[in-house]
Amino acid sequence: MGKTYSSPINPIPKAPKGLAIHHWLNFLQAAYRLQPGPSEFDFHQLRKFLKLAIKTPVWLNPINYSVLAGLIPKNYPGRVHEIVAILIQETPAREAPPSAPLAEDPQKPPPYPEQAQEASQCLPILHPHGAPAAHRPWQMKDLQAIKQEVSSSAPGSPQFMQTIRLAVQQFDPTAKDLHDLLQYLCSSLVASLHHQQLETLIAQAETQGITGYNPLAGPLRIQANNPNQQGLRKEYQNLWLSAFSALPGNTKDPTWAAILQGPEEPFGSFVERLNVALDNGLPEGTPKDPILRSLAYSNANKECQKLLQARGQTNSPLGEMLRACQTWTPRDKNKILMVQPKKTPPPNQPCFRCGQVGHWSRDCKQPRPPPGPCPVCQDPTHWKRDCPQLKTDTRDSEDLLLDLPCEAPNVRERKNSSGGED
């Protein structure tokens, strides 16, 4: 019987060891263009073949898919021949002169030109054979796997875009799915910038006209959520991907994104600093208000964030956020820090040591009384170590020792050498 393979946990199969991730993504994109779509067995055979081909690196530096095709054994199982054939066919298109903007634009790295796929099995849109298309929301394992692939890439970078394009091509998400994916992968600042650029692109597309778009049926975003509107869904996906190209600072966050509210700084002063920095640092034509609202909450100190969360104003107009945080000032914080714990009142009973009222026995400055009379003189007012009679006896014994006769040194040496007197 043939081998069976369980469904992969990661929606994007892992690259073979020794193969660069961008080369592996090219193989995956070619595999997803197969008709009918690739099976798990095809991916297994592709990984198995590439592990062997890496040991013969003549096709890697530079990469040459024609040489790689010659390394495929005859009657090799799976569809590795077809995948490599697609790569050979598309290689000239990706190496075209600069007149081809799709291949040379750093914001749009290869993928290959997307083609409509018929009756393909993809998620969250399901196309079961002989049944209408159905929608299935994202599963957390899918989102986690995609985020793991782009964790080391900045939003909008070539590596980030290549992975996201592959995920969109594989899963065929709706407009709502793309919104959820953006919120999961990117910060609130990046999501706000992307949303503004996407709204501009959608308005232009609706004005110019899109095949299959009906203005009477609602906005493009609503129509793209219909599982049966595959053409409009593809158009919306392209607009969603294109919106990443307008993100300022794809490699690192701009300077104004690092402005934080100090622990003692009033919220109004912090917002004013943000406003000035955005006026001086935002690219021309970029809307300022959504970025200012996003940073006013995300970069505020913990006290102000708690106030905004309690009132449900994390993304409210800036005036409402300022009024909400007026209840917190550094003076209020100092008052809270000056509150001291209540001290325990002194006892009403006399102290066990000195007999006075007003303090506890553990705080008494008088020495602790002895538990009983002195065993030497029977005096109950002192300890044995402080007995004057004991000190007198010790002094008398020392005086007696001083009165004893002392032998001369030569006599003592003579006794020691002879072993003592007879």
From Swiss-Prot:
Name of the featured protein: Gag polyprotein
| Superkingdom, taxonomy of origin | Viruses
- The answer to whether keyword Plastid applies is no
> In the UniProt entry, what is the domain comment?
Late-budding domains (L domains) are short sequence motifs essential for viral particle release. They can occur individually or in close proximity within structural proteins. They interacts with sorting cellular proteins of the multivesicular body (MVB) pathway. Most of these proteins are class E vacuolar protein sorting factors belonging to ESCRT-I, ESCRT-II or ESCRT-III complexes.
A GO biological process this protein is involved in?
viral translational frameshifting
Q: Name one GO cellular component term.
A: viral nucleocapsid
- Region (Disordered) spans which residues? 95-116, 388-422
**What does the PTM comment state?**
Specific enzymatic cleavages by the viral protease yield mature proteins. The polyprotein is cleaved during and after budding, this process is termed maturation.
Q: InterPro entries, per this entry?
A: D_retro_matrix (IPR003139), Gag_p24_C (IPR045345), Primate_lentivir_Gag_pol-like (IPR050195), Retrov_capsid_C (IPR008916), Retrov_capsid_N (IPR008919), Retrovr_matrix (IPR010999), Znf_CCHC (IPR001878), Znf_CCHC_sf (IPR036875)
Q: Location of site Cleavage?
A: L123, P124, L337, M338
Where is a lipid covalently linked (N-myristoyl glycine)? Answer: G2
Q: Which organism is it from?
A: Human T-cell leukemia virus 3 (strain 2026ND)
User: Keyword Electron transport, does the record have it?
Assistant: no
**Which gene is transcribed and translated to give this protein?**
gag
Please explain the role this protein plays, according to its UniProt record: Matrix protein p19 targets Gag, Gag-Pro and Gag-Pro-Pol polyproteins to the plasma membrane via a multipartite membrane binding signal, that includes its myristoylated N-terminus. Also mediates nuclear localization of the preintegration complex.
GO MF terms, alphabetically ordered: nucleic acid binding; structural molecule activity; zinc ion binding
